[in-house]
């Protein structure tokens, strides 16, 4: 259906290690839980070393109106999307020369952590020299599954228009959804996991001119599968309050992954007459350490097949939908690739839902 040719990323300026984040959580939650020390162990045991935020950590101690937070979301998302797209279209590791903006036929913009109408990609088109005829497809509300879903929908677009070049932008500022007055355990655990991140991926159809690509081997998306678990709205998502986005985050997510995901993956692989042993790498959205452990246990994978997911979790935490693009970029730059080997891209999100993509390594140019 489509090739992934490049990924560009942009990270906010404020880097926070887990020790500092745990101190912040103690300050915010110490009077709400008698077992605060036990709960704070999740910061140390979660295999996250650092995360990045759009504001200094002290800023989050005070309450801010939804209006203020959403205005910051628009400004910061636009700034970082611009940087990620520029890198994506001109990354010297991926291209011999930059891809012209006018060559991009469609832009898929994915987010779940703020609101903007016109949507961010429209604002971006006023700042970068895209053609005014570029198709815009904003995708909102898929949470952590959004990046994989954006790639899948973009690949399907390329199947219909095989000469097209298409951008997928995923921008999540999870930190701006933090509500200091929310003293629930879900909010505390979320404080140990989520960070901010923005990324852009360039895809092209099978008949597109890829001669400028430097990739010896590129992931060619062959198929995608979306699955919804019915009656599971309470697993993850948002409640909307006067203060903005209030996190819904079930403690049962790792168990659901372990019990539910394997069947979905098996059905997807059976469709292509493949087995788990045929999959050389799983480029997964790393929801957290327990989710990665559930992937390994449920799918019978070695930790090596999830090394990029583990690496990104350590460096950046859970950046919601943007995370999967960071994982793919890490593997493009550092991972093992062999022609014709198969791999999976996967993510889970609100619904409760899963998005899976099957790819093979094919000649990039």
UniProtKB/Swiss-Prot annotation:
SUPFAM superfamilies linked to this entry: Thiolase-like
Alphabetical GO biological process terms: polyketide biosynthetic process
EC nos: 2.3.1.74
Record field: catalytic activity: (E)-4-coumaroyl-CoA + 3 malonyl-CoA + 3 H(+) = 2',4,4',6'-tetrahydroxychalcone + 3 CO2 + 4 CoA
Residues forming the catalytic site: 144
Top-level taxon of the source organism: Bacteria
Record has Transferase as a keyword: yes
Principal EC category: transferase
Any Pfam family the entry gives: Chal_sti_synt_N
MF terms (GO), sorted A to Z: acyltransferase activity, transferring groups other than amino-acyl groups; naringenin-chalcone synthase activity
Sorted UniProt keywords: Acyltransferase, Transferase
Record-stated family: Belongs to the thiolase-like superfamily. Chalcone/stilbene synthases family.
Name of the protein: Putative chalcone synthase
């Amino acid at each position: 259906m489509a090739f992934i040719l490049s990924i560009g990323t942009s990270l906010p300026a404020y880097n926070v290690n887990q020790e500092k984040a745990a101190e912040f959580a103690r300050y915010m939650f110490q009077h709400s839980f008698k077992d605060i020390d036990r709960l704070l162990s999740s910061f140390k045991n979660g295999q996250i070393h650092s995360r990045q935020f759009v504001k200094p950590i002290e800023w989050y101690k005070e309450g801010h109106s939804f209006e203020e937070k959403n205005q910051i979301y628009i400004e910061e998302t636009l700034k970082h999307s611009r940087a990620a797209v520029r890198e994506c279209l001109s990354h010297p590791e991926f291209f011999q020369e930059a891809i012209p903006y006018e060559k991009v036929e469609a832009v898929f913009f994915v987010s779940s952590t703020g609101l903007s109408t016109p949507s961010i990609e429209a604002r971006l088109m006023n700042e970068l020299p895209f053609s005014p005829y570029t198709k815009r497809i904003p995708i909102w509300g898929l949470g952590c599954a959004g990046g994989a879903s954006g790639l899948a929908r973009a690949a399907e677009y390329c199947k219909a228009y095989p000469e097209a070049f298409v951008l997928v932008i995923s921008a999540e500022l999870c930190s701006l959804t933090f509500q200091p007055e929310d003293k629930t355990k879900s909010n505390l655990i979320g404080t140990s996991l989520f960070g901010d991140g923005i990324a852009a991926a360039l895809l092209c159809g099978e008949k597109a001119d890829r001669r400028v690509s430097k990739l010896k081997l590129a992931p060619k998306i062959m198929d995608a599968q979306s699955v919804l678990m019915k009656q599971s709205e309470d697993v993850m998502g948002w409640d909307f309050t006067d203060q903005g986005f209030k996190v819904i985050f079930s403690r049962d997510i790792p168990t659901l992954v372990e019990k539910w995901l394997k069947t979905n993956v098996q059905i997807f692989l059976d469709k292509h007459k493949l087995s788990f042993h045929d999959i050389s790498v799983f480029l997964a959205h790393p929801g957290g350490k327990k989710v990665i452990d559930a992937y390994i246990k449920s799918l019978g994978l070695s930790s090596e097949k999830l090394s990029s997911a583990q690496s990104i979790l350590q460096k950046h935490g859970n950046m919601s939908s943007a995370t999967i693009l960071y994982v793919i970029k890490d593997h493009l730059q550092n991972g093992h690739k062999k022609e014709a080997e198969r791999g999976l891209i996967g993510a889970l999100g609100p619904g409760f839902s899963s998005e899976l993509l099957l790819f093979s390594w094919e000649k990039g140019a």
